[in-house]
C-alpha cells in the first residue's frame, strides 16, 4: 500500500461530518520514515512481523489437492487495500502491518537428500499458515477519553481452516474495520465492524465484501458508544468481583452458561488483564481508587492480543462487548444479565 496519497475530493465520508471541498490544494508529501514512531504491535502471542515484499518474494502459495491455487495472503491484503482506497478516497493511509505465525517449511526437489544442517535458504520453501494485517487511516483520527484513536482496517486468514487435500472449495477470511488506540495499538472492534467468517471463491468476492462492510459501518456512532465508557467508574471491589466471576464462568455447567452473556476470553487473557490492572501505565490503577469501563475495555483488549491469530478478532470484539455490558449493568440498564459478573 502507498504510504502517502494525494488528497482528492471525497464523496464517501459525508456521514462522518466532513466537508467535501470543491478545490483541494496540493497535499504535502510526508515521508513515512519521518512520521514513523515505535508503537506496540496490534497482536502479540506467537506472531512475528513480516513485510509485504517478503510475503511476495520469499513465500510459496499453497494449492488444493486438485492443484488449484489458494488465494495468497498478499492478494488478500491488496484487495482490502484497494477497497479502502476506493471507499475512503482522498484519505491518507499508514503502512500495512503484517503479523504471521505457524511457519510451514518444505524442500525443493534438489535438496531432498540433504541433511537438515546442510540446508541453505534457497533449498527451503516457506509459507505461513496464519496471517493478520491492519493499516490505519492517518487522516481520520479523533481523541476520546484522553487518547488519540485512528480508524483502522484489516483482516485475518488461517489456512488451517482449509482442506488443502481436497478439491478447491470456498476459502475463509475475516475482515474488520474499527477504531484503534494510538498509544497501545489496541483495536476496539464491535459487531458491525467485523464480517465474521467470510467464505469466497475468488479475490473479487473479498473486494466486494470489504466495500459492503465499510458501507454499513458507522464510525461516528461507533465512536460515541466507546466514548461513553469513560463516564462509568468501577471500584477495586467491583473489578475483583468481575475477575472472580470471569474465572467462575469458565467452569459453569452448560445449562447455566446459556443464561449468561457469552465470554470467550481464556485464563491467560484474564490473568493478563488482572496484571494490567496493577501495572498498565495507560489504563491501570495508576494511584487511582477507581478505573472506568473504558479502562476495563482496554485492559481486556490488551489481554486479547495474546490470543492466536485465528481467535484474536472474536476475542477483541468480545472484550469490547463485555465492557459495554458491564457499563449497562452499572447503570441499571442491563438486559443481558451482565449484572451476574458484579454480584
Which stretches of residues belong to each language-model region?
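A short acidic/basic microdomain associated with nuclease active sites
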Residues: 86-132
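General structural signal for secondary-structure boundaries
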Residues: 43-52, 56-57, 61, 72-78, ...
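Intrinsically disordered, low-complexity regions enriched in serine/threonine
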Residues: 1-35, 114-343
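Feature for intrinsically disordered/low-complexity regulatory segments and propeptides
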Residues: 1-81, 87-92, 96-100, 104
Amino acid at each position: 500500500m502507498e504510504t502517502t496519497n494525494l488528497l482528492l475530493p471525497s464523496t464517501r465520508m459525508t456521514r462522518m461530518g466532513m466537508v467535501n471541498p470543491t478545490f483541494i490544494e496540493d497535499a504535502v508529501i510526508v515521508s513515512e520514515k519521518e512520521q514513523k514512531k515505535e508503537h506496540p504491535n496490534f497482536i502479540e502471542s506467537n506472531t512475528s512481523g513480516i513485510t509485504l515484499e517478503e510475503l511476495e518474494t520469499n513465500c510459496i502459495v499453497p494449492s488444493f489437492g486438485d492443484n488449484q491455487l489458494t488465494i495468497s495472503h498478499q492478494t488478500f491484503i491488496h484487495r482490502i487495500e484497494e477497497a479502502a482506497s476506493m471507499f475512503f478516497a482522498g484519505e491518507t493511509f499508514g503502512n500495512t502491518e503484517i503479523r504471521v505465525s505457524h511457519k510451514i517449511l518444505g524442500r525443493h526437489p534438489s535438496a531432498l537428500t540433504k541433511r537438515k544442517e546442510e540446508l541453505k535458504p534457497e533449498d527451503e520453501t516457506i509459507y505461513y499458515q496464519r496471517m493478520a494485517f491492519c493499516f490505519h487511516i492517518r487522516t481520520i483520527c479523533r481523541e476520546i477519553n484522553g487518547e488519540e484513536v485512528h480508524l483502522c482496517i484489516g483482516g485475518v486468514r488461517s489456512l488451517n481452516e482449509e482442506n488443502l487435500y481436497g478439491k478447491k472449495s470456498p476459502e475463509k477470511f475475516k475482515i474488520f474495520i474499527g477504531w484503534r488506540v494510538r498509544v497501545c495499538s489496541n483495536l476496539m472492534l464491535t459487531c458491525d465492524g467485523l464480517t465474521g467468517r467470510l467464505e469466497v471463491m475468488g479475490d473479487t468476492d473479498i473486494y466486494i465484501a470489504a466495500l459492503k462492510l465499510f458501507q454499513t459501518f458507522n464510525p461516528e456512532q461507533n465512536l460515541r458508544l466507546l466514548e461513553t465508557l469513560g463516564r462509568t467508574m468501577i471500584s477495586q471491589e467491583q473489578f475483583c468481583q468481575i475477575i472472580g466471576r470471569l474465572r467462575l464462568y469458565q467452569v459453569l455447567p452448560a445449562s447455566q452458561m446459556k443464561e449468561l452473556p457469552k465470554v470467550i476470553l481464556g485464563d491467560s487473557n484474564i490473568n493478563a488483564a488482572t496484571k494490567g490492572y496493577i501495572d498498565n501505565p495507560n489504563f491501570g490503577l495508576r494511584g487511582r481508587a477507581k478505573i472506568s469501563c473504558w479502562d476495563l475495555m482496554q485492559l481486556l483488549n490488551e489481554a486479547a492480543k495474546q490470543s492466536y491469530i485465528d481467535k484474536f478478532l472474536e476475542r477483541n470484539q468480545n472484550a469490547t462487548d463485555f465492557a459495554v455490558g458491564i457499563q449497562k449493568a452499572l447503570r441499571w440498564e442491563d438486559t443481558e444479565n451482565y449484572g451476574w459478573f458484579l454480584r
